[in-house]
Amino acid sequence: MWIFSRRILSAALAAGFVCTAVCGPAIAAQKTLSTDIVIVGAGSAGLTAAVQAAEKGANVVLLEKNFFVGGASNFAEGIFAVESELNRLRSDTLTREEAFKHAREMHMYEVNVPMMRDYIYGSADNVDWFMKHGVKFDVIRMTPWEEATWHVIGEYKGKNHGAALVANLKDQCDKLGVTTLTGTPAESLITDKSGAVVGVKAKSKTDDYTINAKAVILASGSISDSNEKVAEWAHRDAKHWHS
């Protein structure tokens, strides 16, 4: 029995060696796509952008380097908002301007003030948009002495919190005909002679993609894992800064 098994093993190893030596690595297929919009990153930002674009009639290709969509958004609990419809139903009194003033003070004014203002003033619209798309929220106070700004994401198809939001958005992308390519990280932007961005180069384990597009949206996530980008954009020593 041992001799028989050893012969089988030897034959299998020999066959594998021959295949490796003769066949070599598989050559990636070259694929070219043309679309209206290509979005890099299928977290909550990328998924939301894909839904909005597809609803307006655009053809959308959504790229994600992981083999699942959502990224860190799957582990989120909720989102911040002031003066949302849910806040009004609760008779919460905090205004966007009050929240904006408090946030600037808490961050000692070391922030991009116009961007922070846009975020706070647009937060209610974000929640209202999600609610119109079937996302459920419960508004809570993070602590007894804070205002009720935390909108905890409710259940969707047996999932809760961030995973529920991601599942909801992915279902809508599928219904709207968005082409989602997981396991396919973007590698570089395509530019024309004038320097305008006209597409994306991407690569999966089996395919090399050239995706020509009228517009490119970068929604690839936080810079907090890159010390160089934190230093460049946040103007802080990333070695001593924890996000």
Predicted regions and their residues:
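Conserved beta-strand-loop-beta-strand element in the redox core of flavoprotein oxidoreductases
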Residues: I190-T210, V216
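Redox-cofactor binding/interface segments in oxidoreductases and associated redox assembly factors
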Residues: V40, V82, L218-A219
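Gly/Ala-rich phosphate-binding loop of Rossmann-like dinucleotide-binding domains
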Residues: A50, A54
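Conserved N-terminal/central alpha/beta ligand/cofactor-binding core
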Residues: A58-N59, K65-T179, G183-P185, E228-D237
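Beta1/beta-strand and adjacent pyrophosphate-binding region of the FAD-binding site
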Residues: K31-A45, V61
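Short glycine/serine/threonine-rich phosphate/pyrophosphate-binding segments
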Residues: G46-A49, D225-N227
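Extreme N-terminal leader/targeting segments of oxidoreductases
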Residues: W2-I37, E55
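Glycine-rich loop(s) and the adjacent beta-strand/alpha-helix scaffold that form part
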Residues: S204, I211, A215-S243
